[in-house]
Amino acid sequence: MTYRLEFLPSARKEWEKLGHTLREQFKKKLAERLEMPRIPADALHGMPDCYKIKLKSSGYRLVYEVIDERVVISVVAVGKRERSSVYERAKKR
């Protein structure tokens, strides 16, 4: 089953601020996650149904939520990992 991709409005703004290369790297990984979104190693503690995609070379993270009822992956936050700021923003949304 393939999931659809959605963005929270605030995550969409963060996405649009990313450079072309970073967006392309995330797109490739998101395409894989649309087929199989639940990767246990990437589950976020304290945030049910939320997972991360990390670009190790650049230090960027993308946090998404899996919504099975609507067959949707919703991007919650995108940003640098610096002091876990991307994860803190994701928790607040």
Please tell me what each predicted stretch does.
Residues 7-8, 36:
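Generic secretory/membrane-interface signal
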Residues 2-6, 12-13, 17, 24, ...:
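Enriched for short, Lys/Arg-rich terminal
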